[in-house]
């Protein structure tokens, strides 16, 4: 057992094996930074007072300059785009959605997946309806007032760009990384 001091915060007692495993984990994460539009980076779980947190900062300080910038895969269609920004190991993903003027996106619901929509630019309407009911919840949102709207499990939902001229830019958090083998996404229009 070794004593590791994370000055000035804490002293941890770790086995050499744990320290080596943590070093390899951080090194793998740095090597996993994409060279091109391969998709989002994966964020490691890192308590801020832990060894992994400090090691990752050290590894990143040696990241080659050309790897400090990398493309993300934009999924583009006539409605706009959807880009996954960051995946986490056990806390989901963060994405950015751009909707063209007048466009409605979504019209689906999830059993256990939940999302948060945060409009950062533009003017939109988020609608939700609990499956099996007729009541539609309407949330008017704008980049002028940053708010978070939770897409509740069991509620079909959409987001509508109300502008005729501006794109609607929405940051989206989802509690799980998308898995095409188990998408937990079911089509149903909010307004029947």
Predicted features along the sequence, with ranges:
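Double-stranded beta-helix
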Residues: 133-135, 162-192
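A short beta-loop-beta micro-motif enriched in histidine and acidic residues
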Residues: 91, 103-116, 143-145
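Short acidic-glycine-tyrosine-enriched beta hairpin
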Residues: 130-155
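Glycine- and acidic-residue-biased ligand/ion/polar-headgroup-sensing regions
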Residues: 112-131
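Short beta-strand His + acidic residue motifs that chelate non-heme Fe in jelly-roll/DSBH
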Residues: 82, 106-108, 126-128, 149-151, ...
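Terminal hydrophobic/aromatic helix or amphipathic segment near a protein terminus
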Residues: 26-65
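A short glycine-rich, His/Asp/Glu-containing loop-to-beta-strand
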Residues: 68, 72-107
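Single conserved hydrophobic/aromatic residue that forms the stacking wall/gate
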Residues: 1-11
């Amino acid at each position: 057992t070794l004593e590791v001091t994370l000055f000035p915060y804490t002293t941890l007692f770790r086995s050499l094996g744990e320290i080596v495993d943590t070093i390899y984990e951080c090194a793998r994460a740095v090597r996993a930074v994409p060279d091109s539009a391969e998709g989002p980076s994966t964020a490691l779980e890192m308590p801020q007072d832990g060894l992994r947190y400090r090691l990752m900062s050290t590894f990143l300080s040696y990241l080659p300059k050309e790897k400090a910038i990398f493309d993300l895969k934009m999924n583009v269609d006539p409605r706009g785009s959807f880009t996954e920004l960051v995946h986490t190991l056990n806390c989901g993903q963060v994405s950015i959605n751009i909707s063209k003027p007048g466009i409605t996106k979504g019209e689906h619901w999830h059993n256990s997946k939940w999302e948060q929509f945060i409009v950062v630019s533009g003017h939109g309407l988020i609608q939700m309806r609990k499956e099996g009911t007729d009541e539609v919840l309407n949330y008017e949102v704008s980049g002028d007032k940053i708010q978070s709207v939770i897409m509740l499990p069991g509620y079909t939902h959409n987001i509508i760009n109300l502008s005729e001229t501006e794109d609607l830019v929405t940051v989206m958090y989802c509690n799980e990384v998308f898995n095409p083998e188990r998408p937990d996404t079911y089509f149903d229009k909010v307004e029947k």
